[in-house]
Amino acid sequence: MILRSAYHLKEADPHSFAIPRLRGRAKAALVEIQADEYGGGREPRMHATLFAQSMRALGLDASYGAYVGLVPGVALAIVNMMSMFGLHRRLRGALVGQLALFELTSTLPNRRYGNGLRRLGLDRPEATRFFDEHVEADAVHEAIAANDLAGSLVDDEPALAADVVFGARAQQLLDQRCSEYLVERWSRGRSGLLRGGR
């Protein structure tokens, strides 16, 4: 939870920068995804709010940046990449590719995280709702992100195809590097957090 807090406590925000930088079907698809991320306009249903609830249910500080000193650079690189893509209009294709890959690959891990919390005796909605919501929402977002967002962007602006692929591959590479870092640390009986965690 601490490792992912830098991402999930502001999850949708960098992608919102792309809304005015897209047009047509791709823009509509991104707005549809973002509307879900922001809870359909209801703060208690915002995904960042749900993640904060999960953190608090586990006794963690849910304020943004509370653990940034414990999060390794390989995990922060994902957050920085999203922000960089979102802040530069010329990288809008890369941001779309990053988001599409994230949505395509998040349902199964979120199901596992939720089930893991339940196995640990944390079968309380405030602990698992974020993960359960992502299983449901991202199952829908998969098709929207792949076809309506990335597919439409490439159809309408073929010159951005390489950027979309770059964004997806960058997300995949950083996810892989983060996973390798964690497995290596855990295999030696160490925390994935810097300074051994709290």
Regions found by a protein language model. Give the residues of each.
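Non-heme di-metal
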Residues: 1-198
